[in-house]
Structures are given as C-alpha cells and as structure tokens.
C-alpha cells in the first residue's frame, strides 16, 4: 500500500502521505483525505435519496432556495471536469501527479451529479415543503476546506506572481468559482423552504391530519438509521402518544388487508397452517438467513482483527498500512456487523408481524365459519393471545437453530488450533449434556402442553364467571367460584413450576459449564506434557466462552421451537374443526311450489356431528309464503332446536332442507337476546344504512319509543356488554327491532314475548308480528299460547319430534292451558285498558349503570403515562417476597464475585508461570482479562504486564508439578463455589418469580370478584380477560425471562467495573461521558417505548372483546349476512394493534443500532489513537489491547443493560395493569361482621324504611322513599310497569347497590351493618337469567358442596329435571360452557332446583319461569308454594298466577310504593293501578304483569 500511495502522490515510500508541506497541508493529503473521501461520502448519501417517492404535485416548480441549490450543484459537477483540462497544459499546470488530479476530479464530478439528481427528487417530494434533510446539506459542505487549502497552496506557490502561467491561473479561477458555487449552495439551503406558491395543489387532507406512513418511501439511509421514526419519538418524548391513531400507519406490506389477501392465496380449507405461512412469507424469511450468515461470520472478525492489531503493536516491524487495515477492519467490521445484525432482527420481526396478522385474521375468519361443534370462548381467546404469540416465536428461533451449530463448529476449529486434541475432553463433557438437555426439553414440552390446557380451563372459567357475576354476587359465591379459579390456577402453576425449575437446571448447567470445561481442557493439556502460557490460557478461555454461547442458547432455541410446535398443533386443531357450510346444508334448489318458502322432509338434526345429543327430527314441514307458524311444546322439547336447524346452526344428519331466497338471509331473534356494546341505534341498524322512516316504524312496532324517551341520550345511549344495562324486556325488543329493520322475507322468532309484560306483548303481537311483518313468513316459538290464536298454523313439538301440525283450533287445546278461573275475576274494560297504557311513568331503572348525559357508557380504557411508577417495582418486589428477593440479589452478587475470583486466580497462576520461565523479566501477575465479561471477543492476546494485584499473593512452591496441582486445586475450588452459587441463584430466581406469579393473580382475582356490579356493566369482558390472559402470561413468563437477563447484565457490569477500578483505573475516565450518551439515548427511547407498550395492551383488549362478541352472536351474524362487516371490523382492530407492535419493535431497533454504533465508535477511537501513538513511538501494545478488549466488553454490557432495562420496563407495564385493577378497582362496601351467629335470621322479616336509590348523582331516583314491611313467612308479589323499580328493590336488598338514604332491616337488623357474605348467605334468589358454568351437574347445583346426592336428586325431581339429568350421565354429567347442553327453560329449572336446596329464610324470585311452558309453570308454582311455605317469598311477577296467590301485592310506580294490599282487595278497588294492570293483562289468557 505504501508503494501505491507513493506512486499516486509522487512521494517517497518511507513517507507516502505527508501531512504537511511547508506552511500548509500536503497536497496529496488534501486531495485524498479532505476532498475525495468527502465527495465519495456525498455520492453515497445522495444515492440513498434517489428512491424518495414524489408528491402528487411533483410537476409544480420548487421554491427559490431549491432552485439555487440545483443550479449550484450542476455547476459544481461541471467545474471539476473543466479543472482537468489545464492539467495537460505545460508548463507545471498540475500541482501533483496526473493520476491524483484525475481521481479527485472524477470523484467530485460523480458526487455532484449524484447530488443534483437527489436534489431534484427531494424538491418534488414531501421534503420540498422544507429545506430537506440536514445531513445531506452538511455533507455537501464538507469539501469546502479542501478548496480553501488548495487556494492557499496556490498562493504559497506563487501562482499569482509573475510570470503568470495560463494553466495554474485557470485552475485557480476554477477553484474560486467552485468556492462561489459552494457559497451559493449554502445560501440556497439557508433560504426558507416554503410555503409553496399560492397556485400549488393542496393535499387532500390538511397537512396536520395527513397520516404518516412508516418506512414506505424512505431513503436507504433513513431505513438503516430509522430516521423516519423521529416524529414518533418526538411525540413520545412530549407525552403525545395517547391513542393508537398517534402512531404512524403501517407499511403497505404489513397492512392486515394486504396480508389477508396474500395468505388467502396460499390457504385452502383443510390445508396445513405451516405450509400456507411458508408459501406466503417463507421465501422472504429464508432469504434473511443470508444476513444471519454474514453477521455470524463478522462475529469472528472482531477477536481475530483485535489479535492482529495487538500483534502489530507488539512487533512494531509491520508496515503502517497493515496497522491501518487492521484498525479500519476492526471499525468497519463492528459497524457493518451492527448494521447487519440490526437489520436482520428488524426484518425478522417484520416477517413475524406479517405472519401474526395472517394468523390472527384466519383465526377470526375461522370463528365466523364454525359449525355447531365450537370450542369454549376462553379456549378461542387463548388461541388468539397466548398460542398465536408462541407460534410466532418460531421466526426468532429457526435461524438460530442452524446459526448456533455453525458458530459451534467454527469455534471448535479455532480451539483446536490453540490447544490441539486437549479440547476433546471439554467437548465430550459438553456433549454429554446434550442428552440431558434433550430430556429436559422433552419434559418442558410435555409440561407446556399441560400448562396450556390448565390455562384454557382457567380463562374459560373466568369468562363464565364474568358473564354471571350478578348471580354470583346475589348468591354470595365469590369465594366458592374464586376457589375453583384458584384451583385451576394452582394446576397451571404446578406445570409452570416444573418448567421454571427445569429451565433453572438448564441455565445452571450451561452457566457453570465454561469453568468446568476450562479445568478439563487445562488438566488434559498439562497431562499431555505441554506447558501452559498466558496466550494459550486466555485464548482458550475466550474460545470456550464462544463455545458456550451457542451451547447455552441452544436449549432456549429448542424450547422456543417446541413451544411453537405445541401451539401450532392447537391452532391447527381449531382450524380443522368442521365449518358452517350452507351450500352443503341446504338444498341447492328452492322448494318446488313457488308459494312455499320453507320445506323440510325427513330431516334429522343434532348439536353434534355423530348424533349423540338430543336429536330433532322433522318428517315433513312445508311453510307457505306469508304464514305465521307457531311452535309450542314442553320445556326442552326442541322448539329452539328447530329454529336453529332452519337457520343452519345444527348438524344435518340426513334429510332435505330447502329455503326460498336463502341468499337474503333470515330475520333472527334468539331466545337469549344478543346485544352489542354499542348505542341502541347501532344495535338496531346493525350496519344497514339509516332510513329515518323505516327506523321510526320499527321503534313504534317494537314499543321502544317510551323506553328511549327516558334514557339519558335516547337511541344514542350506549348499552353494556350483552345489554347488561337494560332490562330483559328491553333486550328482547331491541333484538326484535334489529331483526325487523333488516327487512328479511323469513323470520325466526324464538320466544320474543317471554320477557315483556302484557301491554308490551300485545303491542308487539299486533304492531310488529301481525303488523310490520304481516307480509313476511314468520315462525314463532312461545309458551304463551294465547298469542297464537291468530296464527295460520301451529306445530307441536315433543322430545325433539314434530308430532302434530295444524290450525290453532286443533293444536292449542292439546296444550295444557291455565284454568279459566284466573280470568273470571277480571272484568275487561276498554276504557280502563286504554287508560292503563297512556302516559306510563317510568324511571331509569332499566339503565342500571352510571351513564353520562351523553349516553356514553363505555369509557376508553385508562392508560398510565410517563415512566413506570416506583410503586409498580415495589409491588413486584413484594409479590416475590422481601426475604426471597434479597436472597436472589445476594446469590447473584456472590455468583459474580466468585466468577471474578476464579479469573483473578487464573491470571495470578499464569503470572507466576511467566515469572519462573522468564526470570530476567520481573513481571507482576497478568491482567484478569478473562473476567467473565460476557463477550466472546475477549483476550485473544497476552495482556502482558498491565495488571497490578491488589491483594498479596502466595508464593509459588519450587516444584513445578506441585505448583500445577496447587493452582489447579485452588482454581477448581473457586469454580466449585461459583457453581454452587450459580445453582442457588437459578433456583431462588425460579422460586421468586413463581411466587410473584401466584401472588399477582390471586390479588387480581380477589379484587375483581369484590368489585361492584357497576364496574362489570361498564367494562367489556375482553378488557378484563386481557388482564387474566395476556398480562398474567407476561408476569408468568416474559417478565421473568427479561428480568433474569437484566440482573445478569447488572451483575456483570459491577464485576467489570470492579476489575477496571483495581487494575486499570484510568480507563474509568471514559465511563462518565459514555454513560451520559447512553442515558440520553435510552431516555429518549424509553419515553416512547412505555407508551407504545401500553397502547399495545390497550388495543389488544378490543380484539379479545370482538372475538368473544362474535362467538356469542354467531347465529345472528350469519342469519343477517353481517359476517363480512364483522371481518372488516376485526381487520381494523388488528391494524391498530399491529401499529403498536410494529412501532414497538422499530423503536427497539432504533435504540439498538445507536447503542451498537456508539460502541463501535469507542473501539474505533481507541484503535485510531493507538496507531497515532505507534507512529510517534508512544504506544504500549498491552495497554492498547487491554483498552480495546475492555471497550468491547463495556459497550456490550452497557448496551445489554439499557436494552434489557427498557424491555423489563415495557414488560412491567403488564404488572402495572394488574396493579391498576388490584389497587384502583372500586370495591363493594363490605360492612362489619356482627356477632350474630350463623342463624341470626330466624324469622324472615323484611322492612324498607324510606329507601332512596339513585344510580348516579343527577339522575332521577330509581327508588324514591320506598317504605314497606314484609312479615315473616309472608308471600309478597311485586308488580309494576317496566322501569318502576322492581329489580332495584332486589339490588338494594342484596346490597349490590347501596341506597342514598334510608335503610333495610332483616329481622330488625340493619343490612348496612352486616358483612356482605353474612347478609347474602341468608338470602336466596331465583334469577331471571339462569347462570350455569362449565362443570358437572353436581357442581352447578351445589357450588359450595354443602348437600348430599340424595338432596340433589330430590330437588331435580321437584323441578321435573331428573329424567333429563339421568340421560346426560347423572350428577357427574358435564353441562358444557354456560350450560349449553340444556335448553334455556331447562337451565331456569336447574336454577330453581338450586334454590330449593337453600335454607335461607327469604327467597326472591325474579320472573324465574318465563321460559317454561304453562303446565310446567303450574307444577313449579305448586312446588315453590309447598317448599317455601314457612319462608318469606318476594316474587317479581311476570305471570299472573305467580302472584294472585300471594298474601299481599306491592305495586310500584316511578320508584314509589303506590299500593300495598291483598290481591283481592286491590282487584276490587276501582281505578287502582293493580286493577288497570290486571285488566290490561286480560287481553290474553293467562294474563301477565310487568317486566323487569
């Protein structure tokens, strides 16, 4: 290289590149270093901007500043070429050799041409509104010093003195023109960048609203440096990342719509998921293996070049060019390796996000297509959350699976080069652990599968618990069902405990392995007769650490692959479930008769594909257009199953089903109304265009106008999830209104009249079913047979069979009717009836929640801002346990101290050997350059005489073999202690994180169970489930993993600083400025990282809720043809979550590249200084080598510490969210336990004293001064119109809501003074909506396990369920999720049986028999009267016969008691409200009274 430089510069080989010539810099140095290099950089940088996309207004002229810069750049590209012409002119035109001038001139010309093109592109891009990239302008000005120095050189050479030669004068003039052009360029950049001319085209969106698109259209430099993240990070630093919309939009290739299209091209039903993922994204992913390969190779360049550089400094005989190459190679390798590894991680995560978008979308699409055999909601949510994430961990593990063995092979070869075959002993020891690792991995995989099953069970149980939280609180089952959840959690933690301790064993084996292998290698080497030297020892130690790196990581890689395989199998099982297939289910041809809408012939249906459940058989059914067909029968006879079969929600085992106009769908109103968490209007429109006239007619037909008039915001009022803020009647009517508004030709109505009072039922029948729907075909299931007298036909079902069909006059007499005596006492009066329906006074009882006047119930999920608070760290510390946490820290410090001690002892040993072998050199002990610094690049050189021991060292024995035995014994002893400390630390850490996982979940569950019902009404289930699923999973696994890395990095840094401080104190001077730089970078990153993590969790909850909502309303979605709209909504929610995930990953890579480049800069600076000192004869090779090795280790540790700390903080957001519920969730006032004994309620007297209840300040009172007294054993019926306050009485009695004033007494005891459990244990309720959970019949009947089987069977017989339960397998028969094995009526009967088991003195019945037939209802009323003859019974009336036998009737109106007397007395009082209700109910027999 010296010869080449000498020829190019025309200088001597001894000094090829002189820095000074006279009073100015050397011309060759100026042209090469100050001109050619900056111009080359300008050319490369400009080329990076050539791909910038143009704005839509690119044809418009740019601003004056841009035009001036373009002109100056063009001139600067021409002047260097003109400058070459005088070079050929004699005499002495050129100041240097022709080759040098041509090289410098051509590089400058190419650079400015490239820059001119880049400026043209930027001027017509979005950058044209500003001055453009600052870096580009600054680099363009870098050649200015070279021009100035060249002018000075000409002046010193006398170019301006006579005789004036044309060649030099021409060149000097061109130089001055170039300086002028460069000055013009600077002025052009300084000019304001905009605005555009007034006639410029305006963007479609205002500039402040135009969304940014991440990465797309950015230059190469911006992509490599992540400069495009600057606006996002600036918003994060200012605290402006408050919602997902504040994050830049996804690149095109990450958009969920694009991913869905690409994936669907490779996906077909029944295909293997991994094949489809490979077809869609696999090729791009495999191509990234090249980056991984190059990065792995570059990992070995650092230690090799470092060794060569130290050798160059030690020998001092190699030419300078070699040193320059080593230094440049070291710096270039560090920079290139950092960029490649960073880009590899970034691109891999982008592929992971692509696969994630595709998997989550296909899971949701599959959920929309599921047939009747569908998994529980909790299991589906686990697939969406846990399993999908574990599956996608494959992307980070696959390339490591081949990259680590490659590293292993190369390291083994280098180790062989150092110690020969002695390395085999250590290798054998390492390989012996491979089968051990295989056994551990197998156990981990098996335990993982079991853990996921237990997690499914837990999440499913929590889902059911949340759906039935009202009944749970009514019955006081929080503790019992909480114990069931804890039992599932205990089984889950049992498997997690096995996994964690196996992981701890794995970590211990591989962490202790380096020292053990080192001992084996050194003993073998000595026994083979070789002499240990410092070079051999430290080189071998470094290579052993490089050997351990792949072996240490390999178990984690295998574990990740195994976890991905487990989750892949679970997702594949879900995707393989049979689909809902209308093409195969229905006949392809419509019914033969044009007037026939529906035809079933020989059709056999079942809820499962093999027909093991109750079957529904229809021999023949033909329904003509416009008919009203009633369906009647006993409870559980198959009425709802018949409608589900027509809707395609059952398995058709055989037969023929033909529907005319199938593509138009059905109007479906299910028995359990499905209501979305949205406004009432949105629920009714259900995605259809708003038609004011039609909407008005639907509201009138469904009797919703009066209800809307009392709601806070009318039809814009938001209702809770599943409509919990509405009464049962309101939910039923909104669901019916939704079906009617869709304007279908065939309607399937499953008992929509069951939950409404008589007035509303008559209104729905005449205005809706016989009114708006009169021109449609209707199938109506109902137990209220009086409303079927005007039906065209009635179907009688029994045991799943259609046994009779005919006109109402033939079929209805076969159905047991209510004795007409009930109707004889009521005299119909048209005037009274008319009076009863006018101006009903209502309150807001139907909306039992805290709503603002705007009607908004669902509030945005709260999100913390700023740094994770100190109390979150304290909460996790306390969850681990203070004693255990201190023990973990102590064992960690002890482990690091013994590791440092082992390396220190080894350095002392080698120092003594060198002293004996080189007595002429009195050298102190060598530096412990192998100080366990977690860096594979350490000490491939002999550190020399740089370490001065702090402690006095023992003198070596004179005998050489005794020395070896002595040193090896001490070394092995220290290593053994280190091994025990490592084991102790691994076990303690596993135990601590397990303790924290158990504690956090237990506190969360307890706090949620103790929350008031208002919290559950205003909070989507998915939001709560996100805590129990994703956040708990993070606290279980992800947080301990990254926290372990953080603690290891922190301990390693402390050990390193201790060594630096004792052995080379001056090196610590570099630490403060380095720490300041690192601090500012990580602080800038952390501000955004925290918010992005929070937004990621925030946007995950709607995905959970949307899937749960979809599964709950699947039949309605498919019947109305709304699946496409819901799929689009899922893509929208997924896009918001993917934004957060992508931005989180990109900001992590932004931090990583800066930390790595700063480390490379430190290494490069030390290497450059070393070369300068070497030229001056001042370099100390050992000092330089030690500095470089420690610089490599120090920067790596600081980078790892910053990265792991920020990731730990991000993971702690999950703990923060758990703590938010644990600490901030409102709790029910528990009261104080009174010393009353277990049987304190002996009589059953109830007294309300001036009770006032308002759901929130500012709303009318739901109960307004209610006062009444119920005597012990009295039967009290409670009636009133919708919203009169009936259900509020029960809420106050059970203290689900606390009254504003007044009190409730039970046997003279104020309920507000009682503990909740003490109160509710003495009360019983039969709820309107039955609550069952997954489990056996026994567990559902007796959740607390208080009764024997004989009592359970007796209660079932009294409720006429014994035969059904026997057919299901007895008391141990499984009911399925939500008790779906039973019909709705059977579920209500099971809840009644549950109440029959109670010993409570007070029973509350909330319209408990609305979904059973009249005959069963009569039998049940007799059972209730007999079983609770001596107890106080409060009955909210729904059917007249349930309260006419009561001792007294309480009539409520607008939250006040207006009447209270016996039924006979009130009936005979003229103009009484009870008589009006009674008379209005007589329009049908039997009459009915108010809804909830």
From Swiss-Prot:
It is found in: Cell membrane; Basolateral cell membrane; Basal cell membrane. Pfam families: ABC_membrane, ABC_tran. The keyword Oxidoreductase does not apply. Residues 598-824, 1246-1479 form the ABC transporter domain. The modification Phosphoserine is found at residue 467. It comes from the Eukaryota. Its main location: membrane. The chain crosses the membrane at residues 32-52, 70-90, 102-122, 133-153, 172-192, 293-313, 320-340, 391-411, 414-434, 507-527, 538-558, 875-895, 933-953, 974-994, 1051-1071, 1153-1173, 1182-1202. The modification Phosphothreonine is found at residue 463. ATP 2 binds at residues 1280-1287. CDD domains: ABC_6TM_MRP7_D1_like, ABC_6TM_MRP7_D2_like, ABCC_MRP_domain1, ABCC_MRP_domain2. Gene3D superfamilies: ABC transporter type 1, transmembrane domain, P-loop containing nucleotide triphosphate hydrolases. GO terms for biological process: leukotriene metabolic process; leukotriene transport; lipid transport; transmembrane transport. The keyword Transmembrane helix applies. It is a multi-pass membrane protein. Keywords: ATP-binding, Cell membrane, Lipid transport, Membrane, Nucleotide-binding, Phosphoprotein, Repeat, Translocase, Transmembrane, Transmembrane helix, Transport. Residues 826-840 have a biased composition (Polar residues). Residues 285-563, 885-1210 form the ABC transmembrane type-1 domain. ATP 1 binds at residues 633-640. Its EC number is 7.6.2.2, 7.6.2.3. PANTHER family: ATP-BINDING CASSETTE SUB-FAMILY C, ATP-BINDING CASSETTE SUB-FAMILY C MEMBER 10. ATP-dependent transporter of the ATP-binding cassette (ABC) family that actively extrudes physiological compounds, and xenobiotics from cells. Lipophilic anion transporter that mediates ATP-dependent transport of glucuronide conjugates such as estradiol-17-beta-o-glucuronide and GSH conjugates such as leukotriene C4 (LTC4). May contribute to regulate the transport of organic compounds in testes across the blood-testis-barrier. Mediates multidrug resistance (MDR) in cancer cells by preventing the intracellular accumulation of certain antitumor drugs, such as, docetaxel and paclitaxel. This is ATP-binding cassette sub-family C member 10.
């Amino acid at each position: 290289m010296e010869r080449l430089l000498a020829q190019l510069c025309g200088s001597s080989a001894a000094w090829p590149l002189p820095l000074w010539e006279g009073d100015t810099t050397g011309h060759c140095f100026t042209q090469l270093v100050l001109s050619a290099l900056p111009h080359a950089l300008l050319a490369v940088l400009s080329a990076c901007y050539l791909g910038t996309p143009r704005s839509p207004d690119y044809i418009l002229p740019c601003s004056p500043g841009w035009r001036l810069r373009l002109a100056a750049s063009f001139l600067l590209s021409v002047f260097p070429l003109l400058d070459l012409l005088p070079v050929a002119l004699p005499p002495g035109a050129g100041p240097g050799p022709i080759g040098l001038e041509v090289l410098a001139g051509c590089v400058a010309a190419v650079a400015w041409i490239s820059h001119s093109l880049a400026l043209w592109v930027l001027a017509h891009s979005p950058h044209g509104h500003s001055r453009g990239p600052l870096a580009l302008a600054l680099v363009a000005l870098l050649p200015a010093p070279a021009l100035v120095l060249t002018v000075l050189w000409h002046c010193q050479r006398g170019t301006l003195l006579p005789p004036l030669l044309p060649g030099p004068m021409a060149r000097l003039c061109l130089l001055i023109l170039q300086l002028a052009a460069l000055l013009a360029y600077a002025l052009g950049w300084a000019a304001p960048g905009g605005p555009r001319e007034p006639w410029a085209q305006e963007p479609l969106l205002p500039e402040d609203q135009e969304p940014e698109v991440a990465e797309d259209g950015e230059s190469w430099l911006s992509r490599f440096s992540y400069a495009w993240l600057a606006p996002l990070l600036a918003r994060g630093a200012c605290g402006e990342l408050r919602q997902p919309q504040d994050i830049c939009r996804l690149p095109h290739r990450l958009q969920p719509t694009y991913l869905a299209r690409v994936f669907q091209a490779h996906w077909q039903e029944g295909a293997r998921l991994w094949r489809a993922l490979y077809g869609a994204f696999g090729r791009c992913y495999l191509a990234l293996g090249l980056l991984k390969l190059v990065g792995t190779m570059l990992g070995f360049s650092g230690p090799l070049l470092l060794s060569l550089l130290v050798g160059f400094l030690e020998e001092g005989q190699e030419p300078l060019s070699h040193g320059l190459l080593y230094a440049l190679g070291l710096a270039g390798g560090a920079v290139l390796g950092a960029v490649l590894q960073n880009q590899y991680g970034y691109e891999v995560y982008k592929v992971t996000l692509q696969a994630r978008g595709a998997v989550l979308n296909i899971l949701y699409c599959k959920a929309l297509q599921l047939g009747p055999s569908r998994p529980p909601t909790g299991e589906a949510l686990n697939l969406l959350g846990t399993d999908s994430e574990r599956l996608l961990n494959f992307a980070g593990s696959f390339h490591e699976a081949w990259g680590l063995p490659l590293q292993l092979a190369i390291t083994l070869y280098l180790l062989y080069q150092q110690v020969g075959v002695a390395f085999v002993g250590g290798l054998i020891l390492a390989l012996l652990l491979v089968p051990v690792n295989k056994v551990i991995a197998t156990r981990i995989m098996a335990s993982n599968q079991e853990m996921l099953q237990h997690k499914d069970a837990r999440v499913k149980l929590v889902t059911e618990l949340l759906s039935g939280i009202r009944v749970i609180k009514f019955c006081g089952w929080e503790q019992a069902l909480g114990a069931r959840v804890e039992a599932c959690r205990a089984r889950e933690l049992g498997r997690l405990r096995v996994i964690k301790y196996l992981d701890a064993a794995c970590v211990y084996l591989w962490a202790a392995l380096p020292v053990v292998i080192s001992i084996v290698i050194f003993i073998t080497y000595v026994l083979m007769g070789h002499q240990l030297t410092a070079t051999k020892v430290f080189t071998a130690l470094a290579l052993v650490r490089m050997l351990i790196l792949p072996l240490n990581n390999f178990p984690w890689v295998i574990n990740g692959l195994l976890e991905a395989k487990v989750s892949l199998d679970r997702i594949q099982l879900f995707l393989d479930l049979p689909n809902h297939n209308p093409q195969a289910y229905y006949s392809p041809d419509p019914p033969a008769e044009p007037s026939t809408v529906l035809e079933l012939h020989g059709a056999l249906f079942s809820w499962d594909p093999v027909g093991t459940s109750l079957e529904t058989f229809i021999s023949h059914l033909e329904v003509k257009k416009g008919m009203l067909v009633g369906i009647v029968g006993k409870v559980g006879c198959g009425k709802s199953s018949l409608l589900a079969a027509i809707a395609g929600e059952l398995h058709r085992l055989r037969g023929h089903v033909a529907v005319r106009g199938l593509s138009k769908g059905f109007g479906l109103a299910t028995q359990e109304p499905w209501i979305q968490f949205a406004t009432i209007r949105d629920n009714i429109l259900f995605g259809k265009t708003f038609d004011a006239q039609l909407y008005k007619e639907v509201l009138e037909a469904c009797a919703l106008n009066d209800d809307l008039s009392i709601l806070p915001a009318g039809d814009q009022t938001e209702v809770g999830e599943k409509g919990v803020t509405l009464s049962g009647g309101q939910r039923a009517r909104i669901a019916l209104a939704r079906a009617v508004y869709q304007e279908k030709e065939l309607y399937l109505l499953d008992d929509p009249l069951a939950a409404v009072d008589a007035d509303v039922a008559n209104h729905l029948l005449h205005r809706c079913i016989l009114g708006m729907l009169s021109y449609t075909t209707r199938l109506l299931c109902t137990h209220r047979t009086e409303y079927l007298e005007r039906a065209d036909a009635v179907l009688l079902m029994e045991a799943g069979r259609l046994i009779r069909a005919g006109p109402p006059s033939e079929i209805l007499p076969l159905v047991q009717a209510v004795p007409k005596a009930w109707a004889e006492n009521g005299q119909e009066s048209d005037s009274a009836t008319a009076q009863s329906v006018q101006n009903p006074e209502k309150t807001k009882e139907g909306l039992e929640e805290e709503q603002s006047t705007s009607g908004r119930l669902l509030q945005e999920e709260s999100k913390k801002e700023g740094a994770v608070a100190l109390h979150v760290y304290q909460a996790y510390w306390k969850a681990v346990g203070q004693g255990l946490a201190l023990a973990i820290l102590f064992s960690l410090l002890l482990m690091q101290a013994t590791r440092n001690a082992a390396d220190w002892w080894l350095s002392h040993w080698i120092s003594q050997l060198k002293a004996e072998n080189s007595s002429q050199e009195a050298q102190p002990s060598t530096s412990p350059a192998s100080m366990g610094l977690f860096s594979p690049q350490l000490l491939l050189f002999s550190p020399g005489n740089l370490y001065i021991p702090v402690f006095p060292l023992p003198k070596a024995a004179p005998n050489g073999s005794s020395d070896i035995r002595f040193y090896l014994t001490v070394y092995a002893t220290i290593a053994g202690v280190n091994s025990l400390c490592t084991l102790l630390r691994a076990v303690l850490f596993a135990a601590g994180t397990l303790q924290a996982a158990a504690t956090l979940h237990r506190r969360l569950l307890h706090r949620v169970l103790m929350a008031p019902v208002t919290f559950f009404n205003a909070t989507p289930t998915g939001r709560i489930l996100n805590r129990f699923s994703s956040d708990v999973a993070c606290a279980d696994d992800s947080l301990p993993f990254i926290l372990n890395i953080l603690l290891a990095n922190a301990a390693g840094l402390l050990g390193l600083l201790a060594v630096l401080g004792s052995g080379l104190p001056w090196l610590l001077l570099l630490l403060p400025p380095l720490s300041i730089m690192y601090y500012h970078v990580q602080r800038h990153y952390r501000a955004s990282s925290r918010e992005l993590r929070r937004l990621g969790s925030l946007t995950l909850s709607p995905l959970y809720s949307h899937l749960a909502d979809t599964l709950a309303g699947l039949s309605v979605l498919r019947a109305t043809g709304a699946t496409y709209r819901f799929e689009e909504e899922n893509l929208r929610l997924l896009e918001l979550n993917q934004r957060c995930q992508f931005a989180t990953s990109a900001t992590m890579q932004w931090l990583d590249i800066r930390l790595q480049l700063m480390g490379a800069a430190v290494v490069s600076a030390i290497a450059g200084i070393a070369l300068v000192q070497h030229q001056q004869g001042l370099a100390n090779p050992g000092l330089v080598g030690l500095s470089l090795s420690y610089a490599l280790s120090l920067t790596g540790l600081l980078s790892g510490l910053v990265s792991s700390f920020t990731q730990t903080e991000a993971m702690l957001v999950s703990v923060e969210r758990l703590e938010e519920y644990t600490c901030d969730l409102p709790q029910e006032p528990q009261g104080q336990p009174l010393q009353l004994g277990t049987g304190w309620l002996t009589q059953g007297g109830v007294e309300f004293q001036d009770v006032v209840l308002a759901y929130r300040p500012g709303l009318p009172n739901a109960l307004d001064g209610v006062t009444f007294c119920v005597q012990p054993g009295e039967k009290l019926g409670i009636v009133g119109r919708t919203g009169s306050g009936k259900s509020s009485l029960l809420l106050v009695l059970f203290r689900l809501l606390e009254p504003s004033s007044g009190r409730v007494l039970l046997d003279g005891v104020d309920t507000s003074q009682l503990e909740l459990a003490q109160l509710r244990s003495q009360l019983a309720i039969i709820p309107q909506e039955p609550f069952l959970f997954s489990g056996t019949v026994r567990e559902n009947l007796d959740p607390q396990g208080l009764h024997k089987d004989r009592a359970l069977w007796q209660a079932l017989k009294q409720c006429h369920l014994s035969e059904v339960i026997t057919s299901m397998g007895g008391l141990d028969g499984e009911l399925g999720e939500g008790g779906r094995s039973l019909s709705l009526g059977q579920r209500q009967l099971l809840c009644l049986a549950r109440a029959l088991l109670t010993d409570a003195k007070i029973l509350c019945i909330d319209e408990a028999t609305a979904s059973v037939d009249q005959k069963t209802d009569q039998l049940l009323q007799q059972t209730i009267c007999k079983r609770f003859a001596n107890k106080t019974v409060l009955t909210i009336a729904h059917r007249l016969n349930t309260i006419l036998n009561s001792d007294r009737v309480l009539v409520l109106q607008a939250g006040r008691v207006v009447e209270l007397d016996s039924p006979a007395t009130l009936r005979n009082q003229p103009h009484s409200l009870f008589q009006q209700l009674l008379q209005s109910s007589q329009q049908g027999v039997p009459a009915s009274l108010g809804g909830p």
